[in-house]
């Protein structure tokens, strides 16, 4: 089998920064991309790209997150006889969506090159939709929906392809599987018009996501990036809602990428900056034996992360995402407490 990546010791230079210990005389040069000497710089970068767990070591990752989304839409239903003179109804919709979650993940290093990960979450969602119709007088209607419960359980495996010898980037292959344990959009109760009476806590579909990420040291930072393809598995719903017969539904697959860098200010504190983008393909739904497709989505977000090493076993991480495209959530914040054993 492939030899494990070379282990590299590290020392603190006069500026307080981590640097590899020089190799003994006659030994091959130490690979500058060795991840073990870069844990401080890598601690703040997004999950799924960061350094693998050490062989035989277990860690728990406790986290809480909050996501805020809002959308505004102005619709005119009528005719415009001359520019600026409209006959009909003006309808304005405003939707505010809040999602919070508590997550727990267990990570274990099978070898120095391979890590497995299992995670579960409890999700609470709340949507407030306000509709204003303007004809002779304004008519306002507000709808509040909520839902909470177990989310979709996920499992993943990551494998370090190379050791970063001769200054090359370290490449890591990953495979993630997402279950449908959460209550999906076709599992929740609906009224006689097919309108949901509460919110889903899961997608309702299984999915798999292969990915490749890289880590490339460029002193004093470490550059990171990833590409991924998330494939949903289609499902035959086979039920009638609001007078419409729902057949097979195939949620749109997603192509994702990210790029950024991590920087260690001292042995305890590091931060990261990055950008991630996903192109979500149209969802196809079979309604009354007619296949309809939704629009595709472009979801982009700026990322900012911070990490502080509390003790040898505990660290505190905070990650922010700010949406920069119309389809992206406005803001997402994740507070994580990794615990090493």
For every predicted segment, state its role:
Residues 1-82, 183-185:
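Outer-membrane beta-barrel biogenesis signature
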Residues 48-56, 71-73, 113, 163-171, ...:
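Short loop/turn motifs that connect adjacent beta-strands in outer-membrane beta-barrel proteins
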Residues 49, 60, 64, 104-108, ...:
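Residues on the lipid-exposed face of transmembrane beta-strands in outer-membrane beta-barrel proteins
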Residues 56, 98-102, 147-153, 169, ...:
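Residues that define the transmembrane beta-barrel architecture of outer-membrane proteins
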Residues 57-61, 73, 115-117, 156, ...:
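Residue-level detector of the transmembrane beta-barrel scaffold of outer-membrane proteins
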Residues 65-71, 115-119, 123-127, 176-184, ...:
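Structural signature of outer-membrane beta-barrel domains
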Residues 73-83, 236-341:
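Outer membrane beta-barrel transmembrane domains
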Residues 124-244, 250, 293-294:
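Outer-membrane pore/translocation modules
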């Amino acid at each position: 089998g492939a030899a494990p990546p070379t282990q590299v010791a590290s020392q603190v230079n006069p500026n307080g920064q981590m640097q590899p210990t020089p190799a003994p005389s006659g030994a091959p040069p130490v690979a500058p991309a060795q991840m073990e000497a870069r844990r401080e710089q890598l601690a703040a970068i997004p999950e799924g790209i960061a350094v693998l767990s050490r062989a035989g070591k277990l860690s728990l990752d406790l986290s809480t997150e909050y996501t805020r989304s809002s959308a505004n839409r102005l619709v005119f239903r009528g005719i415009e006889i001359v520019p600026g003179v409209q006959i009909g109804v003006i309808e304005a919709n405003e939707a505010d969506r809040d999602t919070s979650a508590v997550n727990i993940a267990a990570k274990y290093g099978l070898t120095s090159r391979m890590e497995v990960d299992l995670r579960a979450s409890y999700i609470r969602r709340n949507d407030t939709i306000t509709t204003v119709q303007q004809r002779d007088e304004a008519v306002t209607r507000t709808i509040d929906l909520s839902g909470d419960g177990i989310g979709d359980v996920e499992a993943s495996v990551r494998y370090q392809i190379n050791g970063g010898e001769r200054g090359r980037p370290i490449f890591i292959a990953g495979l993630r599987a997402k279950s449908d344990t959460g209550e999906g959009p076709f599992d929740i109760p609906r009224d006689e018009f097919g309108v949901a009476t509460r919110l889903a806590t899961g997608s309702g579909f299984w999915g798999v996501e292969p990915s490749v990420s890289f880590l490339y040291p460029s002193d004093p930072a470490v550059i990171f990036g990833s590409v991924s393809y998330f494939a949903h598995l289609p499902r035959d719903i086979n039920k009638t809602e609001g007078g419409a017969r729902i057949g097979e539904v195939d949620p749109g697959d997603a192509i994702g990428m990210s790029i950024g860098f991590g920087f260690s200010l001292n042995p305890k504190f590091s931060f990261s900056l990055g950008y991630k983008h996903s192109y979500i393909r149209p969802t196809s739904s079979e309604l009354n034996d007619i296949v309809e497709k939704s629009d595709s989505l472009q979801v982009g977000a700026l990322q900012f992360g911070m990490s502080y090493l509390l003790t040898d076993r505990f660290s505190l991480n905070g990650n922010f995402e700010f949406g920069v495209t119309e389809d992206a959530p406005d803001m997402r914040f994740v507070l994580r407490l990794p615990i090493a054993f």
